[in-house]
């Protein structure tokens, strides 16, 4: 074998294949040759060139023809993927030369053109490129010219220096030489301007022959041209066929797309490709997705090395990728690198949108992606010389491809996600068909409680009916009835309540719903099968389904859900009369042997109106199927025609009706549907028309449209009634039933919650589970922060705390409750006579609504989700509402109000219309410590700890730990987290905003203020003022009705007493004789003498008659003209008097009662309805003061311990234990920043105004039973806080002029203080009509010194001068006179030294200046007389919210916050300090309530001194011998706590300094006044001595508003 003398070629040892040797041996044996092959023939060595030719697949791939799908470019079709037959080796040698040309672009950026020429006829291929040529110079080592070296000698390359980072395709030193070796002729032409020579040389016969190199002088532009004729015989080809040319053409297009800045000429024509994006269009143009829409390509040039395009693939994952211009047709790690990023983002989107419930894995997402990648990678590696799969690790790419969020967002909207979801839906359907479909079996096993029809699944299956019952008890009724009609054709299966709304259910829900799957299996249904013809119906086991549910609204809902189930999956079945229902009587009336059945309440009501002598009939209500006996069941089934109602399909309107009721897309239509229903019902009631009902005596069938619009709509309306409260009383029906029962029981002693629930169910006909009822009672009694502002029931026991948001309430078996003393003041008993009481089972139950004296729906808030609507209302301050009512009674507009949660110490600030920012409180104590002392409303302490602080402490994979430690010092009512963090992180957190970092801000949005109005219609209110005004008009009209009722009742009683007195006097005088006379004669005599039949009884009967006539305006004339006293005159009230009545004493007493009653009537007649209302408000506020005072006293007693009787010493309470729960006095308050939140709110509002639909949370699925208690925190509130029975003073709400919207301590508007010496009303001036003047409807407002408690002022007692007739002018004059007297009585007594009062009007709402050092208080303040000094230590700790937005302004200016006698914070009595509440000042908040009677301030010596000063500092009670321990933020130095451990947190120690001791004293130093007294608790000067009853000792508390609970019962 000849050896080539080619320089530089290495020998290769070739091992002969064993199979070849074996074959040669066998041949030798066959030839009877006993000689063996020589060793030399067995073991051979080949040159590298020989090896390449002998084993080409090692280098260029297979040289055998291969047929496969490839992207090619055909002249007539363009870029297309088709089956082609080609030789991979030939394709590869062409590609090597092409990639070399492209590589030159990386060496010379000036290269601009590549020319590719293919001549199939001549078998000539030429590739030309400009740019830097190959150096035409002799290689000094190899002694040959460089072009000859690199094209004509193996293992030569310019790419062997791996230290040099190159982004070229060449790597191994084989490429161009392989093309040379597999060509019959291979010519290289190049010109190098640098060396001023051109070079041309030709190799022939597989690089075995070489011509002489032609070198010429050259001074033109550099270029390189390779021309070769492939050795077709080596590739078993005769010519370059169409397929290989199409493939090579595509590679030319590849180069045009992947080489930036290079134009590619193909056979003399420029290819129409401009960049990579243009190249991608060759693949996707004219291609449509499954919906017929053109494919959308997402393109991003990530950087100069990465160009990525993405679109939808419908043929599994596809990729077209290039690495340094090499077509990596099998992909590689560069493709995975990009695709993994895309998949991870898309799968997040898919999971959010995936309602089917089928799990989606990354590879399934990848199957819908078509990606195009053009990248430059440094020194890439491949798994073979063919370079189809790039194997370099991403870390070695030399660059990163970071795709933008814009790219990912566009990718999620380009059709890929939709395609995935469609695939998921298809897969879900396949799974459903596999698991949930059924076939026709004669017997079914494995379904418990199924009583199968004997003929089901047989030849009579179409005649079989499956009865679906509501529960097991209904099944028993059906089985009893089957004794009449037989079991062959009827099967029974009980449902476990409401079935799934399959229209909106996920795939997972349907797959896992046993009930749905059981019905499918029993009936023999198959998903996606159309039951249009009779043949398909024969595949079913049952020909009909009969629905047998209770005749109530929940039963109607179950019917609707079953109709929806069949309609959604097999609509054609409805057209065949597949569904029917079995109805049972809801009421039976019987008399003697006559029995009437009624199938709807309206039908029964109509019958009652026309029947005489109703009492002769026995009425029985059937609330459920379980009420019927087995005997009645047999009667029902015996008369099957009467009780079976067929559902008849009437056309598209039926489809539309079912979709309307159950589709998520029909939310707005459902609102309109229910609104029209409520309006229709209201009009019917107004005109006395009967309500519509379905099941008359002649009803045999029913359309689906009628069922939805006349029966199912009752459930939807009922759902709203149970979920959404009434504007009038703020209650849902469950809450109203509880209150009704409590009023009726009128317990004077506490009762167990569990027992009360049973009583409610009995007295008010409650038809649901008692567990829900018990939770309603518990929620009505809760009073922690974030629950009720006024709890109508008393929480005697553990009713839940702010730690867990009420979920930590004890079992109802262990806790007690009873009515609050405020309940009957809010809901006066006399108003019960005006209410419309409802009847259930012929039993008188709760009224349609109660009518409180103030809108409870605002005080305790409301929340609920119904059908089509949702309701959300925050809490508001009771006193603020009282003040607004008083303003409205005076004809003034109500002041705007901000939400207010009792005992909440944070701030609530307005962001926009009905949008508020709720902020907790955080203080910076030192360089690495912050203190959190309040959380946003309804952010529960435990939840906050677990969801916010724990992740901050432990960190996550993505975010490092922010804090190093935290300690907890809170109680069940207060919050205190002491958080440690590094100085650097604290600085960073403060720069970012501590409230934001610690998640201490939430938003409260009130755009769903939907309530039932007094007519029972749902109405959406835009503002709280709208609610208040509508309530005001209704309540005022009811005060008029109350007055009418009282005048009538008192008049009747007066007449009765007058008749009794006259009768006694006439008997004594002998004018009347009754002895020995018949009853008839006596009655006739009394009538003749002008005595009236019992006036009280007659008046009551007249009232009842009037009510009946109002309810039944359409009755006959004869029934309406019946006498009010059909039994004749009633004189028992006279004739039944005892003989004792004839005595002188009794006669005088009777006459006195008569005269008193007459005066009462006259007095009442002189009062206006507004007078009655004012009296009720005054009584309520007075009792509210007492209740809150008692609450504070209870807290104080619990915190300070009991003092030993007779001793003044402090109780044994550890100082540090009390201090550690209190805020540090040295912290720097962080002002909540809401600028960004305001901007965001403005953007949302603007967007909404542009036409965005209302975003209301609605219940769209009817398959969930109403739970009554929506999840706490709904969209607007992330974490929900609760409230303490505050141990610290209540944050102060400061009043601002209208226009400012930050809640602070309420002050009078525009009123100035007066000096004590003048002894005149500081507010009295000539402008008595001005809005700021004190009027009888407005409370007396006492200015408050920022250091001293406000003086006790007497509460004005409202007195009505009834000596004059009721006339407007006279009344106004009286009011004015009374007012002047009231003003003088209530004048505040201020210190002589206090000359000026700075009203709060001028304070800026964002002013949160913090006074950390000495106060700027004027010397006059510190030099107050001894009386005021003795109050100095009171309320020495502020709540964290005290340093409110204008605290320092208040301190610096000696501002006296004018607070009403009925202070809205706590309702303190006149001597009680009005705590501040930074629930952000209410806009133009009016002065608080009017005060009934002012009381004298306690003398100094009567200060309670037995209470420990430590605990005093917590509640504001001073101890003479110690400095106060308070929440004050100033420089007041505290006594050292005794702890020597500097590292431990000590709330009593000032950071970085030792607390200096102060001498014991009872008054404050001037320097310390401001810091010790927060804006919440400032002492006030005592009132001047005056006559009147002495006031008992005052208990001072730190809390403001009463223990309020947000009505969590409102969620029931």
Swiss-Prot record:
Cross-link (Glycyl lysine isopeptide (Lys-Gly) (interchain with G-Cter in SUMO2)): 21-22, 165-166, 216, 287, 355, 361, 425, 427, 434, 588, 593, 623, 631, 634, 664, 700, 1080, 1202, 1205, 1214-1215, 1238, 1250, 1259, 1311, 1315, 1385, 1427, 1443, 1477
Subcellular location: Nucleus, Nucleolus; Nucleus, Nucleoplasm; Nucleus
Keyword NAD assigned: no
Binding site for ATP: 100, 129, 157-159, 170-177, 385-387
Entry binding sites for Mg(2+) 1: 470, 550
PTM-bearing positions, type Phosphotyrosine: 1358, 1408, 1596
Source organism (scientific name): Mus musculus (Mouse)
Entry GO CC: cytosol; nucleolus; nucleoplasm; nucleus; ribonucleoprotein complex
Site, as annotated: Transition state stabilizer: 813
Protein's UniProt name: DNA topoisomerase 2-beta
Quaternary structure (record): Homodimer. Interacts with KIAA1210. Interacts with PLSCR1.
Acidic residues bias: start-end ranges: 1362-1379
GO-annotated biological processes: axonogenesis; B cell differentiation; cellular response to ATP; cellular response to hydrogen peroxide; cellular senescence; DNA topological change; forebrain development; neuron migration
Annotated active site: 814 (o-(5'-phospho-dna)-tyrosine intermediate)
Chain positions found as N-acetylalanine: 2
